[in-house]
Amino acid sequence: MVKNSFIPVLSQEKKGKNPGLVEFQIFQFTNRIRRLTSHFELHPKDYSSQTGLRKILGKRQRLLSYLSKKDGIQYKKLINQFDIRQSQIR
């Protein structure tokens, strides 16, 4: 498994940007989530990593909620770009 193969185009665009930006943090969490989900295909009983995945999902959801309130246009753009399902609770 190659770590950086999930979102290679986006990582090239984001290299020069501030890692404190909400968009960049969502990008990093999305990358980690995709890596962990591929990890679970090989190791389905890795429960400690599943707990970590749930924490990351919660953090990303809170950031997405913040971004939707702050800048709805950027939120929709980010959702489409990363293929993230839109939150049911808004």
UniProtKB/Swiss-Prot annotation:
GO annotation terms (biological process) = translation
Q: Cystine bridges: which residues?
A: none
* Assigned keywords, A-Z: Chloroplast, Plastid, Ribonucleoprotein, Ribosomal protein
Extract the GO molecular function terms from the UniProt entry.
Answer: structural constituent of ribosome
Q: Where in the cell is it found?
A: Plastid, Chloroplast
Coiled coil feature spans: none
Chief location bin: plastid
So which residues are the signal peptide here? none
InterPro entries in alphabetical order:
Ribosomal_uS15, Ribosomal_uS15_bac-type, uS15_NS1_RNA-bd_sf
Q: Per its UniProt record, what PROSITE patterns does this chain match?
A: RIBOSOMAL_S15 (PS00362)
Entry-linked SMART domains = Ribosomal_S15
Membrane-spanning regions, if any? Answer: none
Tell me a GO cellular component.
ribonucleoprotein complex
Superkingdom as given in the UniProt entry: Eukaryota
Quaternary state and interactors: Part of the 30S ribosomal subunit.
| Family recorded in the similarity comment | Belongs to the universal ribosomal protein uS15 family.
Q: HAMAP family of this UniProt entry?
A: Ribosomal_uS15_B
Q: What is this protein called?
A: Small ribosomal subunit protein uS15c
Upper lineage is: Eukaryota, Viridiplantae, Streptophyta, Embryophyta, Tracheophyta
